[in-house]
Amino acid sequence: MATKFPKFSQDLAQDPTTRRIWYGIATAHDFETHDGMTEENLYQKIFASHFGHIAIIFLWTSGTLFHVAWQGNFEQWIKDPLNIRPIAHAIWDPHFGEGAVNAFTQAGASNPVNIAYSGVYHWFYTIGMTTNQELYSGAVFLLVLASLFLFAGWLHLQPKFRPSLAWFKNAESRLNHHLAGLFGVSSLAWAGHLVHVAIPEARGQHVGWDNFLSTPPHPAGLMPFFTGNWGVYAADPDTAGHIFGTSEGAGTAILTFLGGFHPQTESLWLTDIAHHHLAIAVIFIIAGHMYRTNWGIGHSIKEILNAHKGPLTGAGHTNLYDTINNSLHFQLGLALASLGVITSLVAQHMYSLPSYAFIAQDHTTQAALYTHHQYIAGFLMVGAFAHGAIFFVRDYDPVANKDNVLARMLEHKEALISHLSWVSLFLGFHTLGLYVHNDVVVAFGTPEKQILIEPVFAQWIQATSGKALYGFDVLLSNPDSIASTTGAAWLPGWLDAINSGTNSLFLTIGPGDFLVHHAIALGLHTTALILIKGALDARGSKLMPDKKDFGYSFPCDGPGRGGTCDISAWDAFYLAMFWMLNTLGWLTFYWHWKHLGVWSGNVAQFNENSTYLMGWFRDYLWANSAQLINGYNPYGVNNLSVWAWMFLFGHLVWATGFMFLISWRGYWQELIETIVWAHERTPLANLVRWKDKPVALSIVQARLVGLAHFTVGYVLTYAAFLIASTAGKFG
């Protein structure tokens, strides 16, 4: 007899009910709880899975390169990137009627195609790719790499090639290698690629495998480098009249500090980007020699942490080294939090300081990339707190951490939680109060009675960075200050860029921005409150001091202790997910509506209508969904119909979530038993039999299913709205 799923848990495999399948899926990646798992084996399994993860990423990118080369219009797009829309891939659908075939035969294609809103065309072009052949070569190269990584993953699971536990616990060596190798050398390699391939291509000089060794990127060669005359590499940059991809107006500089944007592409100067990566390479290669390893030189993180006792912090950072180094959940929490912050920063910088040629003028792509990265940041941040809470339940040792900063966080958690609660209440009541007041007075025909607050502090900060519009005359916006004269010498293009009014750098802000900023602050603080409370109360609370004994997720502690439902760390994570999505809604609505005004040259629409609730509902959501709702109708379809369909489908998935979120165990148990009863009495259907006794989802499982539907539906609905409303206006 074959062993039943899951193989990793004999206990579950012998469960006679459908719980076996659900719990099997739920714990498949919870390696710590698997039968016979040792600490060493745990680390080895996770390590091997990283190779698989990287292989999947390479495979995915290879697929993008391949489909663009095979079915895209890359070579045509390069000739006119502002007017030709990039094609992602062809669509083959047997359900298409003639109307749909015609609607989706777009962007100069001879058959139905999808338009690319990912920005990959701009990226390929910027880094020096100009032909389909180069894209194919890249796709094959990544396929080979993916195979190599899959093999490496398999190899590191073989007994002879499994790293030891001591190797995994050697944090200093790992940090040195990751800092110097992963960040330092890869940044150096990227700077090298930009200097040797991308910059010459941008100046109309092709560099390929056939000539890259014989084509020096700078006429002076390496002589200035070895003689210390490095300024030569910054002399003679591209002129303002440079036509990207040609030698017209091109200079010879390779490492510059120009600031601002290339006038034609509206993206950062490639020579500035190369300089940036070279600087990062130098810093990180030095940083990668910082920590003490086998040679006894450099810093010991353990010694630093144990010695570091700041004022009012008790035992300070004592024993934190071992606490972190012995807890994978702590490490994962830190990694997710860092990556979450970086991903959000990427979203903010991709539109304000676009680095890829012509991407700033592809408005739909800009909107899609901003929203995409902010959503990913939201999921990563919630995951960080989830694993922080699991750390407190599974890995935290109160004795080892006595009176250090971690223990003190737990000891004064009431102060933290109550302050966050106060901030959230303050923000919520005041922001909603202002919106509601404004909404009422506008509804009664007296818009002049709105309470409109100018964000003077934020405007002052913009002025310090050089925005002259507000007349603050401070630092960079004061032409006579030291900051301005220094800036003119070191970043000559910056002030032009910040004051141009046609890009997204330091957008002009007013009362509408002030209100929505505080709405977003409310969302962020409430999400943080729920997550921080969930993590700090994960071991126990006044209501349930022994909570840690019940694990990370439990529905309730039975009828004898009333009030213990919904207080596990899992429940906090579950609730925070809704707040996280809610916050992202406000954030992306704001960004999108603000930019629709900037792009269409009509900023007044946002400024006048974003100060009251009906303005948001009517002038952002309703007005921009008109084209979407008309994607298909009795008279035919247009090329937005796929988004219209996705918009409807997203709503359906989202609404399905509530069926699981609002009804619980009893309903499902009755429903399942009724369905089983009907099956067993229906001809043909009764030939199919369950081997497991069907039981309803547990409360936690039903919440997970509901949350998954809510989340997927929410994302699908807004993605369709965002892309269709922007593409409908700007193509």
Swiss-Prot record:
Membrane topology designation: Multi-pass membrane protein
EC assignment: 1.97.1.12
PROSITE patterns according to UniProt: PHOTOSYSTEM_I_PSAAB
Record keyword Iron present: yes
Binding sites annotated in the UniProt record for chlorophyll a B3: M659, Y667
Catalytic reaction(s) noted: reduced [plastocyanin] + hnu + oxidized [2Fe-2S]-[ferredoxin] = oxidized [plastocyanin] + reduced [2Fe-2S]-[ferredoxin]
Annotated NCBIfam families: psaB (TIGR01336)
Record protein name field: Photosystem I P700 chlorophyll a apoprotein A2
Recorded name of the encoding gene: psaB
